[in-house]
UniProtKB/Swiss-Prot annotation:
It is found in: Nucleus. Residues 1-52 are annotated as: Disordered. One of its GO terms (molecular function) is helicase activity. One of its GO terms (cellular component) is MCM8-MCM9 complex. It is an enzyme of class 3 (hydrolase). The lineage of its organism: Eukaryota, Metazoa, Chordata, Craniata, Vertebrata. It catalyses: ATP + H2O = ADP + phosphate + H(+). This is DNA helicase MCM8. ATP binds at G446, D447, P448, G449, L450, G451, K452, S453. GO terms for biological process: DNA damage response; DNA replication; double-strand break repair via homologous recombination; regulation of DNA-templated DNA replication initiation. CDD domains: MCM8 (cd17759), MCM8_WHD (cd22247). Component of the MCM8-MCM9 complex, which forms a hexamer composed of mcm8 and mcm9. Component of the MCM8-MCM9 complex, a complex involved in homologous recombination repair following DNA interstrand cross-links and plays a key role during gametogenesis. The MCM8-MCM9 complex probably acts as a hexameric helicase required to process aberrant forks into homologous recombination substrates and to orchestrate homologous recombination with resection, fork stabilization and fork restart. In eggs, required for elongation during DNA replication by facilitating the recruitment of rpa2/rpa34 and stimulating the processivity of DNA polymerases at replication foci. Its EC number is 3.6.4.12.
Length: 843
């Protein structure tokens, strides 16, 4: 070992509450003119006061106790017949074999050692001496104390041996054993199984060792907790250190000096014998899996207490596994009277270890960045994932397995499937760069009754971590973060909202158009992937790396293609521009489609397990155009995703699909190939070229980043590390389908002057609609002059109500934009059509 190892163990660890001069270092006391005394029955770290009591001195005890840290862990005196001695020796043998695997400096600095429960079970010598599974569960405090004493003894022997070697090298005397100072070591057992559901956390588990997994929804402030306090006797002045079990204040009942009969004591909070530790509480909410879902019940929560090195191990929204001892606390701090509630207690967990899925406390063996909620995969799961990956047309299988109850909408399901897998976040750990989000956001807008909510619920169900909320019953605090006051302490604590609970997962928001003013709370979360809070003196930022999947109904009940998406939803452009894909679902009557849809609904109602597929001819209202959005291809993606007529389709169960998605998000991190990057760049440049008008939709780098994210998700869907040219071309087709729905007008033509994300069309949509109709008729009839009767008839057909009397072209040009006055009392639109107004007299 190096010289620095010795220095790290030299006495006087000021930061550790259990470190001190228990190796016989005297203190100058206040009373009796001597050293400080100790209570041999209660106090593990105290000192001798007077020569008449040599049997109570630390040095005398240590000479005859082979375990020098015995009094740090056990209140009873050492005895060779102690029932715990055999267990300590077994653990000492175990740690002696494992000590080279641990960082000794880290153990001293933190005051704790992490022990894998699986290693304890696999050790044959330990299993022969101690039935670990039963004894750790039934008597956890004693087993943990034995483990702590064992590692304390191993480290002490190691340090003494090293110190003796250094003394020999320096030529010093070696008659006396070197004095070393090892602090109190907590043994923290992790990977404990089985996990206990919160619904089984009952009074029968009091005092037992349990492990539970959940989401952190509330974190309190860190406070000092006094575990030992020095009390001075008012009669003789003797000082003793009195322990506070579970942090409950108590006063000594008698003085440890035999000659003194004092019964009154004064607390000495500034004494070195007063020990305080960091203390924090968290509230953990259960994870709702498919087999545990219970209707009409709020999720269960449990309070957990963290001390010392466990504090600050998690933030609201983290998924944690807490192992600890079940304790009870009295409800006297509540709002009820003590006399009526003296027997009311609440269960809480005294945490022994906290495993954070983000790797804050216990790091995984994989050094790669953890994406998504960490999941455990059995060998059976891995074989099933391998079987799914080997399917011939995997994209079609996953798209049709997402929501089999909804017929059609293959490209919409394809976009939702890509959002499930998500892209790769860039520069997440680089402090010198701003992170680039990898989670795509998708908005589905359409007429009622087309299955938007069912597809949204299916996505949240398949996601390894999904949160589903409804917009009309959601508040801003419920979406982001809430400051709540603790009734017991009066301090403010953070409670996580839906976006933080969906961190590294999916947050589905239904009825997106009915949220009101809550839209502004989503702006930061959708782009910066975080939630900032500045309230009640607390300024913090919490992670919200979630994909937002929103479903909305247009204003008025039906989608009006004469308006833009912003006008149909009455939503700002800043929010809409953050969505990677915007799908428009229209309920257009079509005989073939309606027939196949009705057959599908009847088959679902009949309970058919395997449904026969039918060829769905999706109606389209778009006409041919020379735009880049409608380049012909050999076989469009929508046709390839459809099932062939008469084909028997067996969808992947959602429970297995959730495992597949979790595996892909956790272990697959694809990158773009040069060919794929070239395809995306060409498509983006073509979009920029076609959208250079004054009133056109701004095509920015957000669209290019969306293409990159979706292409990475397409490669991750097939567990590939490299995104190919075919992946990019399929994503381009999905993007074209999204843009076609948002750019096409009520006549089926592509109008790139429509502002998809803006609201500039709202005050002149009728005028633009009127001028567009005049341009279309002029092109068909090759006549650019219109009489009053024709204009009146066109306005009537378009259901446009013209207010006021227009007797002059200048006035009409002022009232209706895109018209400019021309000589001869005629009006000329922006296009090549001249409109001659002879008489205009309408109310």
């Amino acid at each position: 070992m190096s010289q620095g190892w010795r220095g790290g163990w030299s006495g006087g660890r000021g930061g550790n509450p259990y470190a001190g001069g228990w190796r016989g270092r005297p203190w100058r006391g206040r009373g009796q003119g001597g050293s400080w005394s100790r209570n041999s029955g209660r106090d593990p770290v105290c000192f001798s006061t007077a020569p008449p009591k040599p049997q109570l001195t630390q040095t005398t005890l240590d000479k005859y106790i082979p375990y020098k840290g015995w009094k740090l862990y056990f209140s009873e005196a050492y005895s060779d017949s102690s029932p715990f001695l055999e267990k300590v020796r077994a653990f000492e043998k175990f740690f002696t074999k494992q000590i080279e695997l641990y960082d000794k400096d880290e153990i001293e600095r933190k005051g704790s050692i992490l022990v894998d429960y699986k290693d304890l079970l696999q050790d044959e010598d330990l299993s022969a001496s101690i039935p670990m599974s039963s004894e750790l569960k039934e008597m956890p405090e004693k087993i943990l104390e034995c483990m702590g004493l064992a590692i304390h003894q191993v480290l002490t022997k190691d340090l003494e041996r090293h110190a003796a070697e250094l003394q020999e090298q320096e030529g010093l005397r070696t008659e006396e054993a070197p004095i070393v100072n090892v602090p109190f070591i907590h043994a923290r057992v992790f990977n404990y199984d089985p996990l206990t559901p919160l619904k089984n956390l009952r009074a029968s588990l009091y005092g037992k060792y349990v492990a539970l997994r959940g989401t952190v929804v509330r974190v309190s402030n860190i406070k000092p907790l006094c575990v030992k306090m020095a009390f001075s006797c008012n009669m003789c002045g003797d000082i003793q250190s009195f322990p506070f079990p579970d942090g409950k204040y108590a006063v000594p009942t008698k003085c440890p000096v035999p000659e003194c009969r004092g019964r009154s004591f004064t607390a000495n909070r500034s004494s070195p014998l007063t020990v305080t530790v960091d203390w924090q509480t968290i509230k953990v909410q259960e994870l709702m899996s498919d087999d545990q879902r219970e209707a009409g019940r709020i999720p269960r929560t449990v309070e957990c207490e963290l001390i010392q090195d466990l504090v600050d191990s998690c933030v609201p929204g983290d998924m944690v596994t807490v192992t600890g001892i079940v304790k009870v606390s009295n409800t006297r701090d509540g709002g009820f009277k003590n006399k009526n509630n003296k027997c009311m207690f609440l269960l809480y967990i005294e945490a022994n270890s906290v495993s954070n899925s983000k790797g804050h406390k216990i790091k995984s063996t994989d050094d790669s960045e953890s994406h998504g909620a960490s999941m455990d995969f059995s060998l059976k799961d891995l074989y099933a994932i391998q079987e799914i990956q080997a399917q011939e047309n995997l994209f079609q299988l996953i798209v049709n397995s997402l929501c089999p109850t909804i017929y059609g909408h293959e490209l919409v399901k394809a976009g939702l499937s890509l959002a499930l897998f998500g892209g790769c976040q860039k520069y997440a750990d680089d402090k010198n760069r701003i992170p680039i989000r990898g989670d795509p956001h998708i908005l589905v807008v359409g007429d009622p009754g087309l299955g938007k909510s069912q597809m949204l619920q299916a996505v949240c169900n398949v996601a390894p971590r999904g949160v589903y909320v409804c917009g009309n019953t959601t508040t801003t605090s419920g979406l982001t973060v809430t400051l709540s006051r603790d009734s017991a302490t009066g301090d403010f604590g953070l409670e996580a909202g839906a976006l933080i609970l969906g961190d590294q997962g999916i947050c589905g928001i239904d009825e997106f158009d009915k949220m009101g003013n809550q839209h502004q709370a989503l702006l930061e979360a959708m782009e910066q992937q975080s939630i900032s809070l500045a309230k009640a003196g607390i300024v913090c930022s919490l992670p919200a790396r979630t994909s937002i999947i929103a479903a909305a109904n247009p204003v008025g009940g039906h989608y009006n293609k004469g308006k833009t998406v912003s006008e149909n939803l009455k939503m700002g452009s800043a929010l809409l521009s953050r969505f990677d894909l915007v799908f428009i679902l229209l309920d257009t009557p079509n005989e073939d489609h309606d027939h196949l849809l009705s057959e599908h609904v009847m088959a679902m109602r009949a309970g058919a397990k395997e449904m026969q597929s039918a060829d769905l001819t999706c109606p389209t209202t778009q006409n041919s155009n020379t735009s880049v959005l409608e380049e012909p291809s050999e076989r469009p993606l929508g046709e390839r995703l459809k099932l062939r007529p008469g084909e028997h389709f067996d969808p992947i169960p959602h429970q297995l699909l959730r495992k597949y998605v979790g595996y892909a998000r956790q272990y697959v991190h694809p990158t773009l190939s040069p060919d794929a990057a070239q395809v995306l760049q060409d498509f983006y440049l073509e979009l920029r070229k076609q959208n250079q008008g004054i009133d056109s939709t701004p095509i920015t780098t957000r669209q290019l980043e969306s293409l990159i994210r979706l292409t990475e998700a397409r490669a991750r869907l097939e567990l590939r590390e490299k995104a190919t040219k075919d992946d990019a071309e399929e994503v381009v087709q999905i993007m074209k389908y999204s843009l076609l729905g948002t750019f096409s007008d009520e006549f089926g033509k592509l109008d790139f002057h429509r502002s998809q994300h803006g609201s500039g069309m709202s005050n002149r949509s009728k005028a633009k609609k009127f001028i567009s109709a005049l341009n279309r008729i002029a092109e068909q009839t090759y006549n650019n002059l219109f009489e009053f009767q024709q204009l009146r008839q066109i306005a009537k057909e378009l259901q446009i109500q013209l207010l006021g009397k227009f007797n002059h072209s200048d006035k009409m040009a002022t009232e209706i934009p895109n018209l400019r006055a021309a000589p001869g009392n005629q009006l000329r639109p922006k296009g090549s059509v001249s409109v001659l107004i002879t008489t205009w007299d309408c109310a």
